[in-house]
Amino acid sequence: MSKQAPDYKAKKITQAIRIDGDVQKEVWQQAAWTKRFVDMVSGESGMYDTRAAILWNDTHLYFAFQAEEPFVEAHLTERDSIIFLENDLEVFIDGGDCYYELEVNAANTIYEVFFIWKDAYKKGGKFDIPRFDVHQEQAYTFGGDYDRMGATFWKGTHPRGIRWAFTNFDLSGLETAVQIDGTLNDHSDIDQGWNLEIGIPWSSLELLANGRSLPPTDGDIWKMFLGRFQKLMVGGKEVQPHPAMVLSSHGVYDTHLPEKWSKIQFIH
Protein backbone atom coordinates (compact mmCIF):
# COMPACT_ATOMS: atom_id res chain seq x y z
CA MET A 1 0.00 0.00 0.00
CA SER A 2 2.87 2.38 0.70
CA LYS A 3 3.68 2.50 -3.04
CA GLN A 4 0.32 4.05 -3.93
CA ALA A 5 0.39 7.73 -4.85
CA PRO A 6 -1.35 9.60 -2.02
CA ASP A 7 -4.27 11.97 -2.53
CA TYR A 8 -3.18 13.99 0.49
CA LYS A 9 -0.13 14.19 2.76
CA ALA A 10 -0.82 14.70 6.46
CA LYS A 11 2.03 16.39 8.29
CA LYS A 12 3.22 15.39 11.75
CA ILE A 13 3.37 18.07 14.43
CA THR A 14 4.82 18.03 17.93
CA GLN A 15 2.19 20.04 19.80
CA ALA A 16 -1.33 19.13 20.83
CA ILE A 17 -4.25 20.97 19.24
CA ARG A 18 -6.97 22.47 21.41
CA ILE A 19 -10.23 21.50 19.73
CA ASP A 20 -12.33 24.67 19.70
CA GLY A 21 -13.46 24.99 16.08
CA ASP A 22 -10.93 27.69 15.20
CA VAL A 23 -9.24 26.51 12.00
CA GLN A 24 -7.47 29.84 11.49
CA LYS A 25 -5.10 29.36 14.40
CA GLU A 26 -1.39 29.09 13.70
CA VAL A 27 -1.10 25.31 13.87
CA TRP A 28 -3.46 24.88 10.90
CA GLN A 29 -1.31 27.23 8.84
CA GLN A 30 1.32 24.46 8.98
CA ALA A 31 -1.05 22.04 7.26
CA ALA A 32 -1.55 21.51 3.55
CA TRP A 33 -5.18 22.35 2.82
CA THR A 34 -6.92 20.25 0.21
CA LYS A 35 -8.21 21.48 -3.10
CA ARG A 36 -11.88 22.45 -3.31
CA PHE A 37 -14.03 19.35 -2.87
CA VAL A 38 -15.64 17.93 -6.01
CA ASP A 39 -19.00 16.40 -6.83
CA MET A 40 -19.00 12.79 -5.65
CA VAL A 41 -20.34 11.44 -8.96
CA SER A 42 -19.11 13.77 -11.72
CA GLY A 43 -15.83 14.98 -10.23
CA GLU A 44 -16.72 18.56 -11.18
CA SER A 45 -16.13 21.41 -8.73
CA GLY A 46 -18.49 21.25 -5.75
CA MET A 47 -21.36 23.72 -5.52
CA TYR A 48 -19.89 25.25 -2.33
CA ASP A 49 -16.22 25.69 -1.51
CA THR A 50 -15.29 22.97 0.97
CA ARG A 51 -11.72 22.16 2.02
CA ALA A 52 -10.02 20.08 4.69
CA ALA A 53 -6.67 19.60 6.37
CA ILE A 54 -5.18 16.79 8.48
CA LEU A 55 -2.43 16.91 11.09
CA TRP A 56 -1.19 14.34 13.59
CA ASN A 57 1.16 13.80 16.48
CA ASP A 58 2.16 10.81 18.60
CA THR A 59 -1.15 10.76 20.45
CA HIS A 60 -3.84 12.19 18.17
CA LEU A 61 -5.20 12.47 14.65
CA TYR A 62 -6.65 15.89 13.80
CA PHE A 63 -9.02 17.10 11.07
CA ALA A 64 -10.11 20.62 10.10
CA PHE A 65 -12.83 21.62 7.64
CA GLN A 66 -13.82 24.93 6.08
CA ALA A 67 -17.31 24.89 4.57
CA GLU A 68 -18.73 27.78 2.55
CA GLU A 69 -22.44 28.09 3.32
CA PRO A 70 -24.67 31.13 2.67
CA PHE A 71 -27.42 29.78 4.97
CA VAL A 72 -25.88 27.81 7.82
CA GLU A 73 -28.54 25.42 9.05
CA ALA A 74 -28.73 22.58 11.59
CA HIS A 75 -31.89 21.60 13.45
CA LEU A 76 -30.97 18.13 14.72
CA THR A 77 -29.27 18.43 18.10
CA GLU A 78 -29.63 14.96 19.68
CA ARG A 79 -26.51 12.79 19.47
CA ASP A 80 -26.72 10.16 16.72
CA SER A 81 -29.61 11.91 14.98
CA ILE A 82 -29.71 11.16 11.25
CA ILE A 83 -27.95 14.42 10.45
CA PHE A 84 -27.13 13.49 6.85
CA LEU A 85 -30.80 14.24 6.15
CA GLU A 86 -29.80 17.89 6.66
CA ASN A 87 -26.26 19.23 6.10
CA ASP A 88 -23.09 17.68 7.46
CA LEU A 89 -19.36 17.15 7.17
CA GLU A 90 -18.12 13.56 7.22
CA VAL A 91 -15.02 11.48 7.93
CA PHE A 92 -14.80 7.74 7.29
CA ILE A 93 -11.70 5.70 8.24
CA ASP A 94 -11.04 2.34 6.61
CA GLY A 95 -9.78 -0.56 8.71
CA GLY A 96 -9.74 -3.32 6.11
CA ASP A 97 -12.38 -5.62 7.59
CA CYS A 98 -14.20 -2.70 9.17
CA TYR A 99 -14.62 1.05 8.93
CA TYR A 100 -15.74 3.97 11.07
CA GLU A 101 -18.15 6.74 10.09
CA LEU A 102 -18.34 10.15 11.75
CA GLU A 103 -20.73 12.92 10.77
CA VAL A 104 -20.98 16.37 12.36
CA ASN A 105 -23.41 19.19 11.61
CA ALA A 106 -23.18 22.93 12.23
CA ALA A 107 -24.78 22.52 15.68
CA ASN A 108 -21.90 20.16 16.55
CA THR A 109 -24.27 17.20 16.67
CA ILE A 110 -22.39 13.91 16.25
CA TYR A 111 -23.49 10.78 14.38
CA GLU A 112 -21.25 7.69 14.59
CA VAL A 113 -21.44 4.17 13.15
CA PHE A 114 -18.95 1.30 13.17
CA PHE A 115 -19.23 -1.11 10.22
CA ILE A 116 -17.87 -4.66 10.06
CA TRP A 117 -17.92 -6.62 6.81
CA LYS A 118 -20.02 -9.73 7.40
CA ASP A 119 -17.38 -12.01 5.88
CA ALA A 120 -14.93 -10.81 8.56
CA TYR A 121 -17.30 -11.33 11.48
CA LYS A 122 -16.33 -14.83 12.61
CA LYS A 123 -16.97 -16.73 15.82
CA GLY A 124 -13.95 -16.35 18.07
CA GLY A 125 -12.51 -13.58 15.88
CA LYS A 126 -11.44 -10.10 16.96
CA PHE A 127 -14.93 -8.69 16.41
CA ASP A 128 -16.66 -11.44 18.43
CA ILE A 129 -16.85 -9.32 21.58
CA PRO A 130 -19.80 -7.93 23.60
CA ARG A 131 -19.33 -4.49 22.05
CA PHE A 132 -20.25 -5.96 18.66
CA ASP A 133 -23.03 -8.32 19.68
CA VAL A 134 -25.21 -8.62 16.58
CA HIS A 135 -28.25 -9.40 18.75
CA GLN A 136 -28.27 -5.95 20.30
CA GLU A 137 -31.05 -3.55 19.35
CA GLN A 138 -28.79 -1.14 17.46
CA ALA A 139 -27.03 -3.67 15.22
CA TYR A 140 -28.25 -3.71 11.62
CA THR A 141 -27.29 -5.23 8.31
CA PHE A 142 -26.31 -2.70 5.66
CA GLY A 143 -25.91 -3.18 1.91
CA GLY A 144 -24.76 0.31 0.93
CA ASP A 145 -26.28 3.60 -0.13
CA TYR A 146 -29.38 3.22 -2.32
CA ASP A 147 -28.81 -0.52 -2.76
CA ARG A 148 -31.88 -1.95 -1.11
CA MET A 149 -34.16 -2.48 -4.08
CA GLY A 150 -34.95 -5.21 -6.57
CA ALA A 151 -32.31 -7.90 -6.99
CA THR A 152 -29.90 -6.11 -4.65
CA PHE A 153 -32.33 -5.75 -1.76
CA TRP A 154 -30.58 -8.17 0.61
CA LYS A 155 -26.91 -7.96 -0.29
CA GLY A 156 -26.45 -4.59 -1.96
CA THR A 157 -24.17 -4.24 -4.96
CA HIS A 158 -20.73 -4.22 -3.31
CA PRO A 159 -18.68 -7.31 -4.29
CA ARG A 160 -17.89 -7.96 -0.64
CA GLY A 161 -21.56 -8.11 0.32
CA ILE A 162 -23.22 -6.67 3.38
CA ARG A 163 -21.90 -5.12 6.55
CA TRP A 164 -22.95 -5.16 10.16
CA ALA A 165 -23.65 -1.59 11.26
CA PHE A 166 -23.40 -0.75 14.96
CA THR A 167 -25.18 2.56 15.45
CA ASN A 168 -24.59 2.73 19.22
CA PHE A 169 -20.80 2.90 18.75
CA ASP A 170 -18.99 5.79 20.43
CA LEU A 171 -15.32 6.40 19.69
CA SER A 172 -13.46 6.89 22.95
CA GLY A 173 -11.84 10.29 23.39
CA LEU A 174 -13.44 11.86 20.30
CA GLU A 175 -13.54 15.67 20.36
CA THR A 176 -15.37 17.92 17.90
CA ALA A 177 -16.01 21.66 17.83
CA VAL A 178 -17.72 24.02 15.38
CA GLN A 179 -17.39 27.74 14.73
CA ILE A 180 -19.94 29.54 12.55
CA ASP A 181 -19.17 32.63 10.49
CA GLY A 182 -22.74 33.87 10.39
CA THR A 183 -25.96 33.01 12.20
CA LEU A 184 -27.36 29.51 12.64
CA ASN A 185 -30.85 28.84 11.25
CA ASP A 186 -31.44 32.48 10.29
CA HIS A 187 -32.17 32.98 6.59
CA SER A 188 -32.60 36.73 6.92
CA ASP A 189 -28.88 37.26 6.31
CA ILE A 190 -26.10 35.76 4.20
CA ASP A 191 -23.54 33.67 6.10
CA GLN A 192 -19.95 32.94 5.15
CA GLY A 193 -19.99 29.34 6.35
CA TRP A 194 -18.85 27.13 9.20
CA ASN A 195 -15.68 25.40 10.37
CA LEU A 196 -15.16 22.07 12.09
CA GLU A 197 -12.29 20.65 14.12
CA ILE A 198 -11.95 16.98 15.10
CA GLY A 199 -9.50 15.29 17.45
CA ILE A 200 -9.19 11.49 17.70
CA PRO A 201 -6.77 9.60 19.98
CA TRP A 202 -4.73 7.00 18.13
CA SER A 203 -5.45 4.64 21.02
CA SER A 204 -9.12 4.63 19.98
CA LEU A 205 -8.31 3.42 16.46
CA GLU A 206 -6.85 0.04 17.41
CA LEU A 207 -9.63 -1.88 15.65
CA LEU A 208 -8.97 0.12 12.48
CA ALA A 209 -5.17 -0.28 12.47
CA ASN A 210 -5.33 -3.42 10.29
CA GLY A 211 -1.76 -4.41 11.16
CA ARG A 212 -0.40 -0.87 10.93
CA SER A 213 1.40 0.87 13.76
CA LEU A 214 -0.31 3.42 15.98
CA PRO A 215 0.68 6.17 15.61
CA PRO A 216 1.61 5.62 11.95
CA THR A 217 5.17 5.39 10.72
CA ASP A 218 6.49 7.89 8.20
CA GLY A 219 4.96 7.13 4.79
CA ASP A 220 2.07 4.96 5.96
CA ILE A 221 -1.13 5.30 3.92
CA TRP A 222 -4.65 5.00 5.28
CA LYS A 223 -7.83 5.25 3.22
CA MET A 224 -10.31 7.85 4.40
CA PHE A 225 -13.43 9.54 3.10
CA LEU A 226 -13.68 13.30 3.54
CA GLY A 227 -16.98 14.69 2.38
CA ARG A 228 -19.99 16.89 2.76
CA PHE A 229 -23.71 16.49 2.10
CA GLN A 230 -25.93 19.50 1.47
CA LYS A 231 -29.70 19.72 1.75
CA LEU A 232 -30.82 21.96 -1.11
CA MET A 233 -34.27 23.45 -1.61
CA VAL A 234 -35.30 24.64 -5.08
CA GLY A 235 -38.75 26.06 -5.71
CA GLY A 236 -39.87 24.84 -2.30
CA LYS A 237 -38.85 21.26 -3.06
CA GLU A 238 -35.92 19.30 -1.66
CA VAL A 239 -33.39 18.24 -4.30
CA GLN A 240 -32.81 14.48 -4.21
CA PRO A 241 -30.29 13.07 -3.86
CA HIS A 242 -28.57 15.74 -1.79
CA PRO A 243 -25.51 17.28 -3.48
CA ALA A 244 -22.40 15.48 -2.21
CA MET A 245 -18.96 17.10 -2.22
CA VAL A 246 -15.86 14.98 -1.57
CA LEU A 247 -12.08 15.08 -1.70
CA SER A 248 -11.94 12.20 -4.22
CA SER A 249 -14.77 11.49 -6.68
CA HIS A 250 -16.41 8.06 -6.53
CA GLY A 251 -18.08 8.12 -9.94
CA VAL A 252 -21.24 6.84 -8.26
CA TYR A 253 -23.56 8.16 -5.55
CA ASP A 254 -22.43 5.84 -2.76
CA THR A 255 -20.31 6.90 0.19
CA HIS A 256 -19.67 3.37 1.44
CA LEU A 257 -17.00 2.32 -1.05
CA PRO A 258 -13.64 2.14 0.79
CA GLU A 259 -11.86 1.29 -2.44
CA LYS A 260 -12.83 4.76 -3.74
CA TRP A 261 -11.74 6.72 -0.69
CA SER A 262 -8.80 9.11 -0.57
CA LYS A 263 -5.34 7.76 0.18
CA ILE A 264 -3.98 9.75 3.13
CA GLN A 265 -0.23 9.51 3.67
CA PHE A 266 1.27 10.32 7.05
CA ILE A 267 4.60 12.12 6.80
CA HIS A 268 7.13 13.56 9.25
Which role does the model predict for each range below?
Residues 1-268:
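Structural preference for beta-rich elements and adjacent junctions enriched in aromatics
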